[in-house]
From Swiss-Prot:
It comes from the Bacteria. This is ATP synthase epsilon chain. It comes from Burkholderia mallei (strain ATCC 23344). The gene is atpC. Signal peptide: none annotated. GO terms for cellular component: plasma membrane; proton-transporting ATP synthase complex. InterPro entries: ATP_F1_dsu/esu_C_sf, ATP_synth_F1_dsu/esu, ATP_synth_F1_dsu/esu_N, ATP_synth_F1_esu_C, ATPsynth_dsu/esu_N. One of its GO terms (molecular function) is ATP binding. HAMAP family: ATP_synth_epsil_bac. Its main location: membrane.
Amino acid sequence: MATIKVDVVSAEEQIFSGQAKFVALPGEAGELGILPGHTPLITRIRPGAVRIESESGDEEFVFVAGGILEVQPGAVTVLADTAIRGKDLDAAKAEEARKRAEETLQNAKSDIDLAKAQSELATAMAQLEAIQRLAKIRGKH
């Protein structure tokens, strides 16, 4: 089966680099599925899980807190604001971040504070959802 080169990078480090049969991620207008031969594309991505199906059929999960997706012939690049490997996700930290964001939202004094709190809440909720999805998948194996 055909594959495509996939790179997931954050400002801090390269999170994933390898060949894949399929990539799924949260695009700005909805969930995107990328197969080899996909039309070139540049779009923003929302916070959520990136699912990468490797050549061997294994799945790799990476949580991204938003960023940019670039699809070129033979290559997919995810430039993430923040990226965390699925195995490194921490439900307790994500839940604490959600609570802090909700508190900040309640006490927002300006539009800037409100927008920041909404963004932090969306990221924490997406991270918790990614953790739940990953737990379901791990439970099947």
